[in-house]
Amino acid sequence: SRHLRELVSLTGFPITSTLQGLGAYPGDDPQFLGMLGMHGTYEANNAMHDCDLMINIGARFDDRITGKVDEFSPGSKKIHVDIDPSSIGKNIKVDLAIVSDVTELLKSLNKRFKEKNKNFVSSNKQKTSKWWEQIGKWREKKSLNFINSNKVIKPQHAVQRLYELTKNQDTFITTEVGQHQMWAAQHYKFNKPNRWMTSGGLGTM
């Protein structure tokens, strides 16, 4: 998680996450676009669709993320990093496959970026400024907004309040599968790794 945060800071790139990856990058950081996929944010899904370079670190391109595989991010070059070679190219064809331990790869990438000239970070952020402007427009849609009520407890509001009351504690969140799982994933900002325990593709209850 620390090396991932450093990479995002060095590059100025936006970052999103799958359901199982929540917490690997701080959920309250401005460069985090929220969760990706069927139950993800408008900005995360549009950024993934329109990007020119996609770096997939340890995710498997499942159907909840890709939708129609032939329409998934059609204009991007795709780099897929995974320690398991059988996971690469299984669902989505990629342009560069890297079989590696993620921590070691991130260390190497960060080292190379740091070896660039001192103006690299600021110049790279300038190059992505228009991209961030577009992301800002998508964010204005506020895709996870809901109409609160003073008559009933809205689940989204309950999760948000839980976050506010526990964000300064070392909190672990667990769910089974279903709609409440999606509300938790959408409205609780996981800021540390391994604090989110939930069933993914197997859908166990």
What kind of feature is each model-predicted range?
Residues 2-6, 11, 43, 94, ...:
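Conserved catalytic alpha/beta core of Sir2/sirtuin-type deacylases, generalized to analogous enzyme cores
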